[in-house]
Amino acid sequence: GMALGSLLADYGARRVTYCDQLPFKAIGEAAFLGYGFDLQRFNEVMAGRARFVNTRSRGAFADYATVKVPGGGELASAWEVNRTYVETDVLVSLGKLKSHVSGGITGGMKNLFGIPPSSLYGDDLKQEPSEDALDYRGATMHACTRKPFTSADYFNGKSVEGDHGFNVPRFIVDLNSAFPIHLVVLDAISVIQTAE
């Protein structure tokens, strides 16, 4: 990640935002320390142009961005997400090569599965959205046993309850239609097997 950021800064990027949905309350750099990412070290090699954003909620923004899926989508017609994902000129998917039970091999496309925030799509939600939610999206996007707490009903009802092998690949297509990736960089040296 740091090497890629250094290259992007060298080639003129004014700012490089590393964002991910992390299971920590902190929304900024403190969330990334749990995984060993030190913003100061990144900024030393990137001329101060790096920033870290935990996108598990709306974060510092007043509201969520609603991003439509072109063509209506396979299972979702739109996504409500942290605005970091839309206030960008270039979207780079930076991930580890992983194998998944339901998504096959995680490449650049499956890596976008973390975009929908826990605050609207998370398993630890009870009856309403919560900016404090930290949990994964198993019930909404794997098993499809409940809908997310978005401002409108964007899931079209074509999912198969309990069938993550059907649901996950189709949500991956919908996410990639809504958030086209400009560049994919995969770490295929440190791989993860059977992540889920």
Residue locations for each model-derived region?
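Extended, low-polarity segments enriched in aliphatic/aromatic residues
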Residues: 1-196
